[in-house]
Amino acid sequence: MIENTIIKANNTGRKAAIFYLEFPSLHLVELAAHVGFDAINIDGEHGYFPTEAIDNICRVANGYNMSVTARVPDSTPYWVNLFLDRGVQGLSLIHI
């Protein structure tokens, strides 16, 4: 299981640094890892993220020991499960 780096940072007494990703870019995920971000947040509500992109972002971020959270386009079970099945560790649900 991938450790939740947001909770880990908070447990050590500091706020987690989270990189906000508005479009799919593995280069930005790697750059965020190299400059010290703790996690990636995917903006699936305002940006377009195909399932393959979500898979790849989670894979690369987890390889750098970063958690991935996401804002899903809709709070229906389809979207929630699609993001969770890809490896996202936390969700922001909209319009609840």
Question: Language-model features: where?
Answer:
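N-terminal amphipathic alpha-helix/helix-capping segment at the start of soluble metabolic enzymes
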Residues: 1-19
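Hydrophobic faces of well-ordered beta-strands that scaffold small-molecule active sites
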Residues: 17-19, 40-42, 68-70, 91
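Active-site-adjacent beta->alpha loops and helix N-cap segments on the catalytic face
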Residues: 2-4, 46-60, 75-78
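Conserved small/polar residues in nucleotide/adenosyl-binding loops
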Residues: 94-96
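Glycine-rich, proline-tolerant flexible connector loops at the mouths of alpha/beta enzymes
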Residues: 28, 35-55
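Glycine-enriched alpha-helix->loop->beta-strand junction motifs that scaffold or abut catalytic
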Residues: 35-39, 85-90
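Glycine-rich beta-to-alpha transition loops that act as phosphate-gripper elements at the mouths
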Residues: 21-24, 70-77
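Catalytic cores of alpha/beta
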Residues: 77-86
